Amino acid sequence: MCLAEKDLTWEDKFIDLATNEHLTPEYLKINPNGVVPTLVHENRLVHDSSVICEYLDDVFPDTPLSPKDPHARAEMRAWMRFHEEVPTIAVRTPSFNMAFLPRFQGLDEQ
């Protein structure tokens, strides 16, 4: 979303979580934690959505997404952290169960 808001061009690489593509040796080379997203910019890697957004604001300052006022910027960061820590975690277990539990039903304990 930040790339689009800054009117930047980019190349998407879809990572299929359902097939564990994020756990392949190829993907783990660019993100050892096996999570998405990862930004590759000028052969450098940037992980984590919020960090990527702040990085893009630093590298491409012509269309700023962050407020200039330090207090407003702190509030923005607080909301970004809230988004990462509260709703993301709250939906992780139900989302995992809906997406992956059917694959495991009927399997024996081996």
What are these regions (language model features)?
Residues 1-110:
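GST-like domain detector, emphasizing the conserved glutathione-binding G-site
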